[in-house]
UniProtKB/Swiss-Prot annotation:
UniProt record, GO biological process: tRNA threonylcarbamoyladenosine modification
Record protein name field: tRNA threonylcarbamoyladenosine biosynthesis protein TsaE
Disulfide bonds: none
Function, in words: Required for the formation of a threonylcarbamoyl group on adenosine at position 37 (t(6)A37) in tRNAs that read codons beginning with adenine. Is involved in the transfer of the threonylcarbamoyl moiety of threonylcarbamoyl-AMP (TC-AMP) to the N6 group of A37, together with TsaD and TsaB. TsaE seems to play an indirect role in the t(6)A biosynthesis pathway, possibly in regulating the core enzymatic function of TsaD.
Positions contributing to ATP binding: G34, A35, G36, K37, T38, F39
Residues annotated as binding Mg(2+): T38, E104
InterPro entries: P-loop_NTPase, T6A_TsaE
Organism: Rickettsia prowazekii (strain Madrid E)
Major subcellular site: cytoplasm
Cellular component aspect of the GO annotation: cytoplasm
Cellular compartments annotated: Cytoplasm
This protein's UniProt keywords: ATP-binding, Cytoplasm, Magnesium, Metal-binding, Nucleotide-binding, tRNA processing
């Protein structure tokens, strides 16, 4: 577990995490509303697409796709999904073919996903601090 004391620390931590990602990784981001899931995803996307990339939250349209030179990044927000099957209407099977997948609010579809999965758990502490833990295949994914 890592305590992130500011937005800057969270940003740097997300960038470091992104350096360890590759095509075919599925990253599940968990945490309460306002925990920083979208912020964390933005830094991952910027790592691959460039810091000036216009990144839009997928909250309303459920999916944003970003192109990198070698693969696409599929950024899903499952907050408004009512049925796990709805993810297939959003091109999920296509996303599985050599792309990086980021899923916020993944609880509703987690049981449909094939391991290995990388889980990023964010929790708000006092004074805007965050507690972050990262797990892969039931083992702590520790790169620091």
């Amino acid at each position: 577990m890592h305590t992130l004391n500011s937005k800057k620390e969270t940003k740097n931590f997300a960038k470091l995490f992104a350096q360890n990602l590759k095509p075919n990784d599925i990253v599940l981001l968990n945490g309460d509303l306002g925990a920083g899931k979208t912020f964390f995803c933005r830094e991952i996307i910027k790592h691959f697409c460039g810091k000036n990339t216009n990144i839009i939250s997928p909250t309303f349209n459920l999916l944003q796709i970003y192109k990198t030179p070698k693969f696409n990044i599929y950024h899903y927000d499952m907050y408004r999904i009512k049925s796990p099957e709805e993810i297939y209407e959003l091109g999920f099977e296509e996303a599985l073919n050599g792309n990086l997948i980021l899923i916020e609010w993944s609880e509703i579809i987690k049981h449909l996903l094939t391991p290995p999965l990388i889980e990023v758990n964010l929790k708000v502490l006092d004074n805007n601090k965050r507690l972050c833990s990262i797990h892969k295949e039931n083992f702590l994914f520790d790169f620091l």
